[in-house]
């Protein structure tokens, strides 16, 4: 129980989520260590059950035959996973998320469809139209995590932007997207975008269509607090996640905002056994400061333990991804579902 002990060590500052026979419940107001007592004036005395949800991320899925991708989506829905996710990269050969998620929506009826969507490098009006129409066609099943893109120089070049501009471009674009999705006619003259008497139709089925954010730098955490609807980091420990959650909520208070306590999730990579040398090297390149086994559980018990620790840290949405593609996707989903879906509420 390494992860849980770390979180509870921080209990006086970060607080606790208590459990009941009905599921995961926010701690009562006045409970010692209540998370929402971190000096932010938020009153969550009307406690509510945390809705635990599990999605599945298909990274590098561009090599999948279309029949297998279709079956993967059908299996996810049949097994009662909450969502399927396609990260966006420019050069890795993965599916284009807008195209593939349109197909996923057509293959399913209830499965939510999501992407880590790169905003910098896109035209705001076109992106607003594309996402609004995908949400409309999927009958309100679209989920979006807005990202600036990978730090790799080739990826940045493929976006057609200057690396140092990406955060500012996203900051300027997000309010434009929200106004367009709300049905406004938009005029805007900014550093990166010029918009004149612009509006879109049809509007998204979801009102509002939410934008979640990731990231770990202080600027990224402040961005979530300032303009985000939710936060979903990756490649960090539950202890680090608890600290980041606190920073997001403190930032939100500075901007007179509240982040819904249900809107904290994590990108969680797992392995079916000891990490391969390639997987270890890849993880160490991204996080050289930490043992990869602290980030990636390598057994069913380890996966359940780290999920438990993330729940204790106040996170309730999980995007699960195998560290390497399985030999059989259907069998992998069956096994994964048997391990985690009993926690879904």
For the regions a language model picked out, list residue spans one by one.
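N-terminal beta1-alpha1-beta2 module of alpha/beta enzyme domains
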Residues: 35-108, 207-209, 323-326, 331
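An alpha-helical appendage that flanks or caps ligand/catalytic pockets
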Residues: 44-49, 159, 163-204, 234-345
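Flexible, glycine-rich active-site loops centered on histidine and acidic residues
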Residues: 46, 51-65, 120-187, 234-235, ...
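Hydrophobic faces of well-ordered beta-strands that scaffold small-molecule active sites
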Residues: 52-58, 84-86, 113-115, 142-146, ...
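Short, acidic/polar
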Residues: 64-75, 130, 213-223, 298-309
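Acidic (Asp/Glu)-rich catalytic clusters
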Residues: 77-78, 101-109, 131, 135-141, ...
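Conserved, mostly hydrophobic/aromatic
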Residues: 80, 104, 134, 177, ...
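Alpha-helix-loop-beta-strand connector modules within alpha/beta enzyme cores
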Residues: 97-114, 173, 334-345
């Amino acid at each position: 129980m390494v992860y849980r002990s770390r979180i509870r060590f921080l209990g006086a500052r970060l607080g606790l989520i208590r459990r009941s026979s009905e599921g995961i419940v926010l701690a009562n107001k006045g409970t010692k260590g209540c998370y929402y007592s971190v000096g932010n004036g938020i009153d969550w005395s009307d406690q509510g059950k945390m809705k635990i949800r599990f999605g599945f991320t298909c990274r590098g899925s561009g090599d999948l035959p279309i029949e297998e991708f279709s079956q993967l989506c059908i299996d996810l829905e049949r097994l009662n996973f909450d969502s399927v996710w396609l990260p966006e990269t420019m050069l890795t050969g993965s599916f284009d998320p807008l195209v593939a998620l349109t197909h996923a929506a057509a293959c399913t009826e209830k499965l939510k469809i999501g992407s880590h969507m790169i905003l910098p490098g896109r035209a705001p009006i076109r992106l607003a139209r594309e996402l609004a129409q995908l949400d409309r066609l999927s009958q309100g099943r679209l989920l979006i995590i807005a990202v600036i893109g990978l730090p790799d120089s080739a990826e940045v070049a493929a976006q057609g932007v200057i690396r140092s501009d990406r955060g500012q471009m996203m900051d300027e674009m997000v309010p434009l997207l929200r106004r367009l999705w709300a049905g406004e006619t938009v005029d805007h003259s900014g550093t990166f975008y010029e918009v004149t008497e612009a509006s879109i139709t049809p509007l998204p089925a979801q009102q509002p269509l939410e934008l979640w954010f990731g990231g770990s730098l202080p600027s990224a955490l402040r961005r979530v607090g300032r303009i985000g609807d939710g936060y979903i980091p990756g490649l960090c420990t539950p202890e680090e996640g608890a600290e980041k959650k606190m920073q997001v909520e403190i930032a939100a208070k500075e901007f007179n905002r509240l982040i819904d306590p249900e809107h904290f999730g994590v990108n969680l990579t797992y392995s079916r056994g000891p990490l391969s040398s390639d997987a270890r090297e890849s993880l160490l390149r991204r996080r050289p400061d930490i043992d990869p086994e602290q980030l990636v559980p390598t057994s069913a018990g380890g996966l359940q333990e780290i999920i438990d620790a993330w729940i204790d840290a106040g996170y309730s949405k999980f995007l699960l991804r195998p560290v390497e593609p399985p030999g059989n996707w259907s069998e992998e989903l069956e096994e994964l579902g048997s391990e985690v879906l009993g926690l879904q509420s």
